[in-house]
């Protein structure tokens, strides 16, 4: 979103930034979100060691659910491939994602439980203006994110077309479309998730999610 890029001091991208969240990150809309534990590989004689998450963050996003096989789709036909819409919480560990030496977006966003989806798949005929939906997130009862899908940098048609030119999309695939301002990383000082936090998030016409944050466990 335009205003999200501004809050984190990032320039507006000229093209969409693509990353993948694995199926192991998928969870239900009201399932617990588990803080991850990463690993620092050994260097020389120093042993590898586990590292607790310290910068896990929230991102409420509109999810586009694909309804038909889509490959190299022009923008003019992109909406034909939409089955409907859902809510996605694109939970992200910023240290794993953005570390100057070894940051990787998939590593930071692909941890177990980091992709709550739902509660519903609302078909596209029920959402007449997907590019004008209120979108919000609360943390422990305090409103953190409060935006609208009309401030997305790239619209739904552009995203479907762009992604489908690099990878074939199949029915059930979900494209998460970015987040409005109010993420923890953008606050001064930053505020990240910790054990016991509760996230509540929603989008007009798509329902609401609630997640408790728990510490890492096997």
Where are these regions (language model features)?
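Short coil/turn connectors at secondary-structure junctions
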Residues: 13-16, 22, 52-54, 58-61, ...
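N-terminal accessory regions of nucleic-acid-interacting proteins
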Residues: 71-85
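Structural motif
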Residues: 16-18, 24-25, 32, 61-63, ...
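Short loop segments at secondary-structure junctions
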Residues: 23-24, 67-71, 91-92, 124-126, ...
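Short, structured patches in soluble enzyme cores that scaffold and shape functional sites
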Residues: 21, 37, 58-68, 86-91, ...
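Catalytic-pocket segment enriched in acidic/His residues
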Residues: 4, 12, 94-218
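Extended, compositionally biased flexible segments
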Residues: 1-52, 58
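Glycine-rich, charged/polar anion/phosphate-binding loops
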Residues: 32-39, 48-51, 68-73, 100-104, ...
């Amino acid at each position: 979103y335009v205003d999200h890029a501004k809050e984190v001091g990032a320039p507006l991208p000229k093209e969409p930034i693509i990353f993948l969240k694995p199926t192991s990150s998928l969870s239900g809309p009201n399932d617990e979100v588990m803080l991850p534990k990463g690993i620092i590989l050994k260097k020389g004689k120093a042993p590898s060691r586990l590292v607790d998450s310290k910068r896990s963050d929230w991102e409420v996003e509109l999810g586009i659910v694909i309804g038909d096989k889509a490959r190299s789709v022009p923008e003019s036909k992109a909406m034909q491939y939409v089955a409907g819409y859902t809510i996605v919480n694109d939970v992200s560990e910023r240290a794993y994602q953005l570390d100057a030496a070894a940051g990787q977006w998939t590593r930071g966003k692909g941890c177990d439980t980091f992709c709550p989806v739902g509660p519903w798949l609302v078909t596209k005929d029920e959402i007449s203006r997907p590019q004008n939906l209120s979108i919000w997130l609360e943390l422990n009862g305090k409103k953190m994110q409060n935006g609208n899908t009309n401030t997305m940098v790239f619209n739904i048609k552009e995203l479907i077309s762009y992604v489908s030119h690099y990878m074939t999309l199949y029915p059930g695939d979900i494209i998460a479309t970015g987040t409005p301002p109010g993420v923890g990383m953008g606050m001064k000082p930053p505020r990240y998730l910790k054990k016991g936090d509760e996230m509540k998030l929603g989008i007009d016409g798509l329902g609401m999610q609630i997640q408790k944050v728990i510490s890492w466990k096997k």
